[in-house]
C-alpha cells in the first residue's frame, strides 16, 4: 500500500503520473494470483497504464535476501516443478490478459536462463541456457483465450458407466468429471 499511497498523494498534489511499473521477480509459490490481481486493480484506480517489468519466475522459493544465485550450476528439474512453473506463468498471463485495458506491456528480465541475474539453475525465463524455448514459452505464446474464462456448469449427474447405485464419478454436460476421494488422515 505504501507505493499506492505515495503515487496517489503525488497525483493529488498535481504531479502528472499516468502509469506505473510493477517489477515481477516472482517464484512458483508467490505472490498469489489473488495478490497480483488485487495490486493491478488497486493501481488501476490511480493510473491509466501499468507495465510489468523485469519479469522472471524462478523455480525456488527464496525471496528477498534469501535468494540463491547459481551461475554455471545445473541440476535436473523434477517434472512437478516444471508443471508448477508453467502453471505460474499461465496464471500470471491469464491475469494480465484479463486486465489488458490497463496492463500495456510485459518486459522480461532477459530472454534466457543463461543470462539471468539469478543464474541458470533458477530457470526463471522463457528460454533455456541454450536459447531454446522452454515449455513456459509455449504456455505464454500459445494460450487458448477460451480457457481464460471457463465456467463449469454445475449440472453433474452420475456417469452412465458407474456400477449400479454408485454416485461417483459424476459428469456434466460439458464433459467434466467429478470424483470423490476418500483419504485417511
Predicted regions and their residues:
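A short alpha-helix capping/helix-coil boundary motif
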Residues: 17-19, 71-73, 157, 168
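A cross-domain feature marking catalytic cores of carbohydrate-active enzymes
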Residues: 1, 19-26, 52-55, 108-110
Amino acid at each position: 500500500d505504501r507505493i499506492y499511497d505515495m503515487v496517489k498523494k503525488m497525483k493529488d498534489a498535481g504531479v502528472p503520473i499516468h502509469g506505473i511499473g510493477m517489477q515481477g521477480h516472482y517464484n512458483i509459490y508467490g505472490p498469489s494470483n489473488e495478490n497480483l490481481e488485487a495490486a493491478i486493480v488497486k493501481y488501476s484506480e490511480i493510473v491509466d497504464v501499468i507495465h510489468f517489468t523485469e519479469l522472471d519466475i524462478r523455480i525456488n522459493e527464496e525471496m528477498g535476501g534469501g535468494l540463491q544465485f547459481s551461475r554455471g550450476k545445473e541440476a535436473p528439474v523434477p517434472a512437478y516443478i516444471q508443471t508448477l512453473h508453467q502453471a505460474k506463468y499461465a496464471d500470471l498471463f491469464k491475469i494480465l490478459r484479463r486486465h489488458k485495458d490497463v496492463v500495456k506491456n510485459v518486459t522480461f528480465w532477459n530472454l534466457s536462463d543463461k543470462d539471468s541475474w539469478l543464474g541458470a539453475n533458477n530457470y526463471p525465463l522463457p528460454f533455456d541456457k541454450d536459447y531454446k524455448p522452454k515449455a513456459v514459452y509455449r504456455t505464454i505464446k500459445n494460450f487458448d483465450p477460451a480457457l481464460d474464462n471457463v465456467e463449469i456448469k454445475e449440472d453433474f449427474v452420475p456417469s452412465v458407466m458407474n456400477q449400479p447405485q454408485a454416485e461417483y464419478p459424476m459428469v456434466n454436460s460439458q464433459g467434466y468429471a467429478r470424483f470423490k476421494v476418500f483419504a485417511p488422515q
